Amino acid sequence: MSEVKIGRKKEKCENCTKQCNKKQSDESINSLQEKGVASGEVRESTSVQQVLLSACLSCDGCISEDEGKRISQQNLDEINHVLALNKKCDTSKHKILVVSVCPQSVPFFAVKFQLDVSAAAQKLCGFLKSVGVHYVFDTTIAASFSILESQREFVQRYRRKHHDANAMPMFTSSCPGWIRYAERVLGSVVTPHICTARSPQQIMGSLVKNFFARQQKLTPEQVFHVVVAPCFDKKLEAVRDEFYNSILESRDVDCVLTSGEILHLMEQSKVTVEEVDSAPLDHVIGEISDSGLTRHDGRGSEGFLEHIFKHAAKEIFGLDVQDIVYKTLRNRDFQEVALERDGETLLQFAAVYGFRNIQTLVHRMRKGKVPYQLIEVLSCPGGCLSGRGQAEGEGGRPDRTLVQQMEEHYSSLPVRLPETNPEVQRLYQDWLDGHDSPHAQQSLHTQYKDHTHLPAHITNPDIQW
C-alpha cells in the first residue's frame, strides 16, 4: 500500500480510537492516531509525524478519514440525541433503544459501585432504563454462539489440514485491534487463517437487529442498538462495512460506548448508586427459569482457547479434558497449552496477549514454523478486562489494582457451558433455522480480507505454519 500520512502527536500515539471523540484541530491532518509502531520508519520533523501504514502495529492500525467520522459519532451526544427525539411528539422519529452489555464491563461497575457482580448489573440496568433505555441485554448469549461456531470451525479446519494450506493454524479473537493489524499489515499471510465466527458484539448486533426486532414487529432501522464494552476499539469494529445493511440503512451495532463513558453518563446525570432502582436484565426471547449472570470457562476474555481445546480433544481424539494447565513462556500473556497422549503431542495451542507478545509472534512467523494449531490473540495485555475503556489509570497505563479487582469479580460468576444453554439451542432453531443453515452462516460468520499490498519483508514466502 502507498504511504498514508497520519497527523500524529507523540503523546497521543497510545490510544488512537480514544482520541476519536476529540477534535484535533491543531494537527495538520484530521485523522486518528495509532497506538504504536512495531518496525519500519517513523520520521519525526516536528510534533507531527508521518507513519507508514505497513510499519504500524497497533490496536486499530490506520483509520481513514471516513472511518474517523463514523467513529467520532459514537459518543454520549449520539445517545442523548436519540433520547431527545424519543421525547418529541413526532413518533415517526422514535426508536426503540437497546443496550447490550459485555460481561467484561460488568465487573468494572461492580468495583465502582462496591457491589457484587449481579447487584451491579441490576443497578446498571436500572440506571439505563431510568434515562430512557427500553431493553438491556447481556452479550454472554452472543459469546456462546461465537464459541460454538469457533469450535465447529476448528474441527473442520483440522480435518482438512492435509489438503488445505490455509486450514492451520486457526487464529481466534474477538479483538478488533488484532483483526485490523492482520488485515492491514500481515494481509494474506494471516487473514485466511482467522476464524470466521463473528465476535460476540457483532453476533449480538445481528441477533438484536434481526431476531429481536422481528419479534417486536419492528424493522432494524427502528431499533437503536448500543453496546457497552471495555474497549474503545470496539467502536472501530462496529463501523466495518460488513456489518452495515445498505438497503435498510442500518448497522448491526449503531453505537459503542465504553464502560467509562457509561460511568461518565451517570456522573452527568448527578445520580448516586444508592438512588438508582435495581432492575433485572432482559432476555432476547423472554424470561427463562435460570436468569442469573454467568460466564464462560477460561480467562476473562470469553475463554475461546479453552472451549475450543476441550471440544477438539473430545471431538477429534475422544479425550475428556477437565482442567487445562498453561505453560508460561515469556510472561503470563504468552502461554501454551498442549494435549498429550502416550508421549505424543496431539494439540498445541497458544494465548498471545499484548503489543510486545504479538511482535514476538510475528517475529517467529517470519523466522519459520509456528507449532500451534490455534492461537488466541488479543491486543490488550491481560485480555479484555484490561481494556482502556475501563482500566486505564494515570499515565495511560492499566490500573493494576482495578484490573485485579475486576478479575476477582469476574471469576466469582458461575460458569455455564454454551452447549448446555437452552436459550442458545432454542435460538438456533427459532432464529437461524438450524446449526448449519445458510441463515446461520450469514448471521454468525464474516470474512476477513487482505486490505493492503504488503512489502516483501512482511509477505515472506519462507513463513511456514
UniProtKB/Swiss-Prot annotation:
Alphabetical list of InterPro entries matching this protein: Cytosolic_Fe-S_CAF, Fe_hydrogenase, Fe_hydrogenase_lsu_C, Fe_hydrogenase_ssu
GO molecular function: lamin binding
Record keyword Calcium present: no
GO annotation, cellular component aspect: lamin filament
Pfam families with a match to the protein in the record: Fe_hyd_lg_C, Fe_hyd_SSU
Entry's localization field: Nucleus
Superkingdom of source: Eukaryota
The keyword DNA damage belongs to this UniProt entry's keyword annotation: no
Record's keyword terms, sorted: Nucleus
Protein family membership: Belongs to the NARF family.
PANTHER family linked to this entry: NITRATE, FORMATE, IRON DEHYDROGENASE
The protein, known as: Nuclear prelamin A recognition factor
Native source organism of the sequence: Danio rerio
